[in-house]
Amino acid sequence: MTTKEKIKDAFIASVIEKQTVKISDKDIVRRAKISRRSFYNYYADRQSITEDIYIETIESTIKECFDKKMTTEMFITEIYKAFFKNKNFFIVAIKDDEQNSLFDTIIERNQIVFSYLYKDIIQDQIKLDYLSYKYASTQVMLLKKWLNNGMVESPEFMTEVYLDSHKNYENMHESIINKKTNW
């Protein structure tokens, strides 16, 4: 096991055990049985570990899905499955509300993915920036709700909800726009 893997494993185990991401560097170093210097050779802080865990588990899944040229439904399901497989960590990590939290990381990283996907379709850079942020934020808000609810629903169910929200919007818009606003 590499030093970097020891650090991540120690962090994940501590987060799950203590039910918080507010784990000190000292605790991580002690649990990983490494020096502080070794820790700082790889990571600046716990947020950078969280980001690396996200990249390793979720972004690697995204890249695999692209390589396999999966359908949209299969693709989205695999992403939800990757979160589900690591739910003990992600359920705790999503609750962190500090700057550079998992929530911020997912939005930022998803925005990069969406920008990449749509850059050839949407030529206006400002519009691309806003739309990629919109898609990333929408996806992350749905994910956050699922995580905060304890991931009771299946990855397949979440895929259905995610895809339905995009497919049905235009159809629903016509019937919704004519409703009275009496809430």
Map each language-model feature to its residues.
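Basic, amphipathic alpha-helical hairpins
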Residues: 13-20, 67-68, 120, 147, ...
